Design a protein with these regions (language model features):
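Conserved catalytic cores of very large enzyme subunits
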Residues: 1-129, 150-152, 156-290, 294
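Conserved phosphate/anionic-ligand binding catalytic regions in large, soluble enzymes, centered on
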Residues: 129-143
Length: 295
């Protein structure tokens, strides 16, 4: 591993393996003595026993459409929704913090969670500082399409500018509130369809934005783009370091793709510091109605 990227750099520096929660959620560092930041060069991060309290995802194309329809500045409208998510997370921390350790003795009293050695009647708020809360990102590709009619494969500058802005705002919230906020490249397995429905109801069908059954998840290029695996890795790499609360880069291959080439591309992704996924197309037998998936 080259050490590029958050996951590999943590391993290179601290020999700490960061396992994802689910398919792509990763915890921001929390240091044993310094908390959000290392107390000194000997302080080490802790990942075991921590968790994420939840993700709330922005509907970026909807926000741009709203700003245009109301003749308002896009970033003014975006700020409104960022503050909304911020307040939702603060309420969640407050709600959870008021719970007693007796609600989950294994986690809060017997050490299941980091610092979880409270008495049954104690509130768990003190345990929540190392736990993250995520601002989710979907449909960066469709945001770019709505902005100037180009995909992130063709352009992507506005999408990158917006993600950099969100990253800056969330960092400010983190400092002001003292909570571990993070930006999450939302997988949006069902949300990607719901967001299209929401957009259509309000703003109708817009080519390459809401004329498909789903939006692209996180910062991914649209699945219909005619690009090579290397091009996809490089195009999505622009957004990689801006979503440290969780993300995945994946490439889809036909079922008969050269296995050695796939291995080479996975190694390339690791050198780039990616958390890499491989999607293989299904092979159907029209005569026997069988489906084959290669190992």
């Amino acid at each position: 591993m080259s050490g590029q990227g958050y996951i590999s750099s943590m391993y290179k520096q601290y020999k700490k393996v960061i396992s994802p929660m689910g398919c792509r959620a990763f915890l921001s560092p929390w240091y044993e003595r310094g908390g959000m930041y290392p107390a000194d060069d000997k302080d080490v991060p802790v990942f075991t026993g921590r968790f994420n309290i939840g993700a709330v995802s922005l509907h970026l194309p909807m926000i741009l459409a709203k700003a245009r329809s109301e003749s308002r500045d896009f970033y003014e409208v975006l700020d409104y929704y960022l503050e909304m998510i911020r307040n939702l997370h603060k309420r969640t921390y407050e709600y959870l913090g008021a719970m007693k350790a007796s609600t989950n003795p294994l986690a809060y009293c017997e050490g299941g969670f980091y610092g979880g050695h409270l008495k049954p009647n104690e509130r768990i708020k003190k345990l929540l500082k190392p736990m993250t809360a995520s601002f989710g990102i979907t449909a960066l590709n469709e945001l770019q399409e709505l902005y100037n009619g180009k995909s992130i494969t063709e352009d992507g500058e506005f999408a990158l500018e917006v993600l950099e802005y969100i990253n800056k705002k969330v960092s400010e919230f983190k400092e002001e509130d003292g909570w571990l906020y993070a930006i999450y490249g939302t997988p949006a397995e069902s949300l990607c369809g719901l967001q299209v429905e929401q957009f259509r109801k309000k703003y109708g069908i817009v080519e390459n934005v809401s004329d498909r059954p789903y939006v692209s998840n996180s910062f991914h290029c649209h699945v219909t783009e005619d690009i090579t695996p290397i091009e996809k890795q490089d195009l999505e790499g622009r957004f990689w370091e801006l979503c440290n609360g969780g993300k995945i880069q994946y490439v889809r291959y036909p079922i008969d793709y050269n296995v050695q080439a796939i291995k080479s591309l996975i190694r390339r992704a690791m050198d780039l510091g990616y958390y890499e996924g491989v999607n293989l197309s299904l092979a159907y037998c029209d005569d026997l109605s069988l489906i084959h998936i290669s190992e």
